[in-house]
UniProtKB/Swiss-Prot annotation:
Entry annotated with the keyword ATP-binding: yes
InterPro entries on file: Dimethylallyltransferase (IPR039657), P-loop_NTPase (IPR027417)
Listed name of the protein: Adenylate isopentenyltransferase 6, chloroplastic
Domain of life of the organism encoding this protein: Eukaryota
Family: Belongs to the IPP transferase family.
Length: 342
């Protein structure tokens, strides 16, 4: 990832003036003014972080907030979504869903650039935050890669220590943060989320997932040394499938063995996605135990309504209406209060 670091330049000084915030809910204009580090040592620049496991709606919420707290821009902290060219594989938020909000470190690097380390992400994201704050814009960081989130926000960061490695102690989590943070955790109860994720895999396949995975397939790549985008769920599973059934065989008739192998591959991808949820949630809980103040938002009802494609709990509301009421409105109030704090 050496070539990525050439994008870095000396960090900008923080003006530390956060944006004038307007909302669509008729609230008065909110102004939060903070002096820079040189003016008052106890005042830190403000950053909003949206975290959570895969498939909970983090990207959607980041756009919802950015369009209500203008001017705001979004910084991606998903380690797979930094890559371009494989938008279905990495489940990158499509342009038409970005709401016209500028996104940083999203679909920016080629897979051949290598793997971005937490230390490199810290440098790149810090530069983006500095530029936004100096332009009086609110930085909204969004992503479920907890190693990136910890690296970016921790006041004390050791690139040689992985605080989420098996057996690592709680003391490896730095509770002192570099910024004054409002951290929102979008959560969904596992049985509902697992069904949603399985459906999402099916939708990704319909959108061309297998074709993109075929482009990534390289028979000479050591399966034990996966780096960068090749760590994305689905790559390993379909690599095994493509070794037996190369893509050029698609025009032929699928026998029972091939159909069974394909179905087993898709099943393995779904199961691995659900296991990832458990790992991500464990890391979030470790951050909380380590002293991070994280506000949980329960999006279960909204996701369940989307699954049912009808009503939730007899209220006659669709998933988007429930999302607006229980996630967006609550988040707006939390962020408004956060921006008013000195």
């Amino acid at each position: 990832m050496q070539q990525l670091m050439t994008l870095l330049s000396p960090p900008l000084s923080h003006s530390s003036l956060l944006p004038t915030v307007t909302t669509k809910f008729g609230s008065p204009r909110l102004v939060t003014t903070c002096m820079g580090h040189a003016g008052r040592k106890n005042i830190k620049d403000k950053v909003v972080l949206i975290t959570g496991t895969t498939g909970t709606g983090k990207s959607r919420l980041s756009v919802d907030l950015a369009t209500r707290f203008f001017p705001a821009e979004i910084i991606n902290s998903d380690k797979m979504q930094i890559y371009k060219g494989f938008e279905i594989v990495t489940n990158l938020i499509p342009l038409h869903e970005q709401g016209g909000v500028p996104h940083h470190l999203l679909g920016q690097f080629h897979p051949q650039d290598g793997e971005l380390t937490p230390a490199e992400f810290r440098s790149l994201a810090t530069l983006s935050i500095s530029k936004l704050i100096s332009s009086k814009k609110l930085p909204i960081v969004v992503g479920g890669s907890n190693s990136f989130n910890h690296a970016l926000l921790a006041e004390r960061f050791d690139p040689d220590i992985d605080p989420f490695s098996p057996g690592s102690s709680l003391s490896t989590i730095c509770s002192d943060l570099r910024y004054k943070c409002c951290i929102l955790w979008v959560d969904v109860l596992e049985p509902v989320l697992f069904q949603h994720l399985c459906n999402r895999v099916d939708q990704m396949i319909e959108s061309g997932l297998v074709e993109q995975l075929a482009e990534l397939y390289d028979p000479v790549v050591d399966s034990g040394r996966r780096l960068g985008v090749r760590k994305t769920i689905g790559v390993e599973e379909f690599d095994r499938y493509f070794r037996v059934y190369p893509k050029e065989m698609d025009k032929g008739i699928w026998d029972l063995a091939r159909k069974a192998a394909y179905e087993e591959t898709v099943k393995g991808m779904k199961e691995r996605t659900c296991r990832l949820v458990k790992k991500q949630k464990e890391k979030i809980m470790k951050l909380i135990r380590g002293g991070w103040e994280i506000k949980r938002l329960d999006a279960t009802a909204a996701i369940m309504a989307e699954l049912n494609q009808s009503t939730a709990k007899g209220e006659g509301k669709n998933g988007r209406e429930i999302w607006e009421k229980h996630i967006v409105d609550e988040s707006v109030e939390i962020v408004k209060k956060f921006l008013l704090e000195v």
